[in-house]
Amino acid sequence: LPDQAHALPHITPVQDWHQAPAVAANNALPVLQACPSPATLPAFGQIQATAGRMAADSITHAARATLRGQCAALVTAPIHKEALALAGEPFPGHTEMLQALAAQHTGTPVADMPVRMMLANAELKTVLNSIHISLRQAIEAVTQEQLLQTITITHRFLAQQLQTQTSTPAANQPTRAPIIAVAGLHPPAGQVG
């Protein structure tokens, strides 16, 4: 893909994932239609089960391709949670759906594969302690166990990233450990909050 963030690459449809590297080498964005279009496309602006089904099928297809190593990463667009529910999907959003697909791929029970959502760029990485729950539930989710799990997941990921970035550290130089800041629930969190 082009290095310039402002340059939009040309979108090129591909029939198979194997065509993607050649298309990308020509500074184009390879796009594979993951699931067939229905005879009638869902109407814009209307919440429909058909749209939810197409979104779920597309995410499932792309996630499985990524888990198989056919893709380096998965980028998802916003999905409508109500349309997902109308399509019969039990997940409130992407994160839970991707967690279930990853657990299925590894043969791990979903409960044994906790995940968190990270918003990241080169300057800042932010990990959410909870998602897709009400404010009351989010406040209740701020427990020592939940926070430690979030910090542990984040630490493992960042340590792996730092190790990758410093592939061959100089002799006698320790690998840098991730430093993680934890924001309080409200500004005076340390004042009996």
Q: Where do the PLM segments sit?
A:
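Structural signal for conserved beta-strand scaffold positions within catalytic alpha/beta enzyme cores
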Residues: 13, 33, 117-120, 128
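Generic beta-strand structural signal
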Residues: 73, 113-116, 124-125
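Short glycine/proline-enriched loop/turn "hinge" motifs that connect secondary-structure elements
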Residues: 22-26, 118-123
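Acidic/polar active-site rim loop that often engages polyanionic ligands
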Residues: 77-80, 126-134
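Mobile beta-alpha loop/short-helix "lid" or hinge segments that flank ligand
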Residues: 119-127, 180-184
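Contiguous, glycine/small-aliphatic-enriched amphipathic segments in soluble metabolic enzymes
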Residues: 1-96, 149-193
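Active-site glycine-rich loop that binds ribose-phosphate moieties when present
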Residues: 96-113, 133-160
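Active-site loop-to-helix "anion-binding N-cap" substructures in soluble metabolic enzymes
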Residues: 90-92, 110, 118
